[in-house]
Design a protein with these regions (language model features):
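N-terminal targeting signals for export/organelle localization
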Residues: 1-70, 196
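Extracytoplasmic
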Residues: 38-40, 90-93, 122, 163
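Structured segments of extracytoplasmic/periplasmic soluble domains
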Residues: 46, 109-112, 116-119, 182, ...
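Flexible, glycine-rich phosphate/dinucleotide-binding loops
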Residues: 52, 104, 134, 175, ...
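Short active-site neighborhood of thiol/selenol oxidoreductases, capturing the structured segment around
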Residues: 57-108, 113
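Structural microenvironment flanking redox-active thiols in thiol-disulfide oxidoreductases
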Residues: 91-141, 150-156
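Thiol/disulfide oxidoreductase modules built on the thioredoxin-like
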Residues: 138-143, 148-196
Length: 196
């Protein structure tokens, strides 16, 4: 005897999974990331090379004791195993590439970022592997620093739903804008010149 409740639950779960995955990998520009002039959201997250084991969520707290966001402000969480937006901003202009590591077009964007990074030593480049573990982030095979946003908190703060999303930040942490979808090397160069 089949149980309609079980079948309905399985169907609803499959539908929810499809909608979630489609949102992450969609080419549609429902969200465009941060816009020029938006405040730079602080974050601190483990690098893919960190020794953190188990669930290592990013810190997006702006003050002490903010529960799941973090027990201390994200800007104060620093170290050789941490990717920190405040630290990046203090060191000059930078580019953040948000990628969903299983999606090939996201992975493909990293090669162009590496090429452009070589030509612009005064601009820092970093990758955020969205909803990834350290192991998943390490599969990206890039020379750029890769942080992993295990629970998607940073992607949420940066309004990321499409992969790849690139956020360009000028000196002093001024957001210059974001792009959604893959960019050519020439398009990357144009954006990087705006912030350098």
């Amino acid at each position: 005897m089949k149980r309609p409740g079980v079948l309905l639950a399985v169907f609803a779960g499959a539908l929810l999974l499809f909608i979630s995955f489609n949102t992450i990998v969609s080419d549609k520009q429902g969200s465009k990331g941060l816009s020029a002039g938006d405040p730079l959201p602080p974050f601190a997250m483990p690098l893919s090379t960190s020794s953190c084991r188990g669930r290592c969520d990013a810190n997006v707290a702006t003050a002490p004791d903010q529960g799941a966001a973090g027990t201390k402000p994200a800007c104060s969480v620093r170290g050789p195993e941490v990717l920190n937006s405040c630290e990046l901003a203090e060191k000059g202009p930078f580019v953040l590439a948000f990628v969903f590591h299983p999606v090939q077009r996201c992975r493909d964007q990293l090669a162009g970022l590496q090429r452009v990074a070589i030509r612009h030593p005064g601009v820092r480049f970093a990758v955020v592997a969205v909803r990834a573990s350290a192991e998943g982030a390490r599969t990206l095979k890039t020379s750029l620093p890769v942080g992993y946003d295990h629970d998607g908190a940073v992607a949420n703060e940066y309004a990321v739903v499409v992969c790849p999303t690139l956020t360009f930040v000028a000196a002093g942490g001024k957001v210059a804008g974001s792009t959604v979808g893959s960019l050519s090397d020439a398009e990357l160069e144009t954006w990087v010149k705006r912030i350098s």
